[in-house]
UniProtKB/Swiss-Prot annotation:
InterPro entries: AcMNPV_Orf112. This is Uncharacterized 20.3 kDa protein in HE65-PK2 intergenic region. It comes from the Viruses.
Length: 169
């Protein structure tokens, strides 16, 4: 869903300057409002500081990364400015052979890396500690596996419409 919005400028014909797309288990902790308005990155990824590497091998071809796809901040005007160049990244997703979480994650990470290098001449470092990019929205999240077909009890998120949302002040 996040990638669809990121790569489809028609979906971004909205009356907002910023869109924060995030998983249900994310909680906004704080917003650096000045940084939000002055940074010019079309997409702002989020980080998992527990993962120390840009590509941390797991098993087989799978990997973890300090770059995370649980949330993405989209600066609508900047995406519109780069819409022609972003079409090329859309092709990577349209030609993707597998339809599983790992391949979507891999292509998302690769797209973020390519966009930052191409548009902003920024190369994400191999080691998280060397990363100088700081997000303007600080989030917490619960790493779980909510994307799996069989959920573990700890990750079994149940939405109860009678429970009002709680916002941190």
């Amino acid at each position: 869903m996040k990638v669809t919005a990121m790569l489809n400028p028609h979906l971004l014909d909205v009356a907002y300057n910023y869109l924060l797309l995030m998983d249900m288990d994310c909680v906004v902790q704080s917003v650096q409002w000045k940084q939000l308005s002055t940074d010019t990155y079309c997409f702002e990824p989020f980080y998992d500081s527990q993962i120390k590497w840009l590509y941390a091998p797991k098993s087989g071809q799978s990997f973890d990364s300090y770059l995370e796809n649980y949330a993405t901040l989209i600066r609508v005007k900047q995406v519109q400015q780069h819409r022609k160049e972003l079409i090329l990244h859309c092709v990577d997703f349209l030609t993707m052979k597998a339809n599983d979480n790992f391949m979507v994650f891999k292509n998302y990470i690769n797209m973020i890396i390519k966009v930052y290098l191409q548009f902003y001449n920024y190369r994400f470092p191999i080691n998280f500690e060397d990363n100088t990019m700081k997000p303007c929205v600080n989030l917490t999240f619960r790493r779980g596996g909510s994307w799996k077909t069989q959920l573990q009890p700890v990750c079994n998120y149940v939405y109860k419409s009678k429970n009002m949302p709680k916002f941190i002040k």
